[in-house]
């Protein structure tokens, strides 16, 4: 029943999306949606995470996790950053993302408003938008490339000089591939729609990550992030950092990013803490394979 509903939603989204003006990024997304819809024929829910699996977060890299949180679990991810751009220094927090597993392979997430404090120009400080989303793990079978589809929208609740005007929907596809000896690759393709923006109606974001597990609890990563607006030049930066699991349900992390061109921040330094609470509410969970290792 869940796969039928998900496939129907994706099919309708693809149909509506195809009616919009097309860019190269939108062509790629339409193709991805059709592949996702086709995959519902054979996709099974028995490989998605359970409470026996360790916490996997969307931090500290820009690339989000390709897997969902377990059914009935609530995951809270937080962080604080310090950044510099064009002579201004900004401190932002708490960058809180709430992730709830509402069914096998399906989660509901919300990015809560984050406060951006401009150290040199306090009048340019304020809150970002609240952004709810649905995330569906498409390829849950262990041993293969993990892939998820996310559809969300940033609602116009933030401060005018921090958040853009109007609602901003987005469609996102994070993926990951575990290699041998603790190495892994991951990435993400996102299309942001900005119908109220007079200069650029859309931004395509691509990321690519190389990760290495250095101990049973710690791992390091290097990440490329590129934002490509429909009009104007891109913003590109290199991000690196690591994470440490205090327990199966708790994580500490850090990251350091350096801008690669003048459109990106000069630097970003941040730290974070995430925690998962299991079996908080009832959610449907299908039989599954043994937990991942």
Regions found by a protein language model. Name each.
Residues 1-53, 280-293:
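Cleavable N-terminal export/targeting peptides
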Residues 44-293:
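Transmembrane beta-barrel domains of Gram-negative outer membranes and organellar outer membranes
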């Amino acid at each position: 029943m869940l796969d039928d509903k998900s496939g129907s939603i994706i099919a309708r989204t693809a149909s509506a999306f195809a009616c919009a003006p097309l860019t190269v990024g939108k062509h790629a997304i339409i193709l991805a949606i059709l592949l996702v819809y086709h995959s519902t024929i054979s996709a099974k829910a028995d490989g998605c995470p359970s409470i026996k699996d360790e916490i996997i977060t969307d931090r500290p890299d820009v690339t989000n996790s390709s897997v969902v949180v377990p059914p009935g679990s609530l995951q809270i991810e937080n962080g604080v950053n310090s950044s510099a751009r064009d002579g201004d220094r900004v401190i932002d927090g708490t960058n809180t993302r709430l992730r709830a597993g509402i069914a096998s392979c399906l989660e509901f997430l919300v990015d809560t408003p984050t406060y951006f404090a401009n150290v040199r120009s306090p009048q340019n400080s304020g809150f970002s938008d609240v952004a709810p989303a649905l995330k569906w793990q498409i390829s849950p079978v262990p041993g293969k490339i993990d892939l998820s589809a996310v559809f969300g929208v940033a609602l116009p609740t933030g401060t005018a000089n921090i958040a853009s005007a109007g609602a901003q929907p987005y469609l996102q596809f994070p993926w990951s591939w575990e290699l041998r000896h603790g190495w892994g690759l991951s990435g993400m393709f996102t299309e942001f729609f900005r119908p109220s923006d007079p200069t650029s109606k859309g931004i395509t974001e691509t990321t690519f990550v190389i990760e290495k597990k250095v101990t049973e609890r710690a791992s390091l990563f290097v990440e490329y992030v590129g934002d490509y607006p429909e009009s104007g030049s891109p913003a590109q930066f290199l991000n690196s950092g690591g994470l440490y699991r205090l327990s199966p349900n708790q994580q500490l992390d850090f990251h350091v990013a350096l801008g690669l061109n003048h459109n990106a921040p000069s630097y970003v330094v941040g730290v974070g803490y995430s925690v998962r609470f299991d079996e908080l509410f009832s959610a449907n969970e299908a039989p599954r394979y043994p937990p991942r290792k």
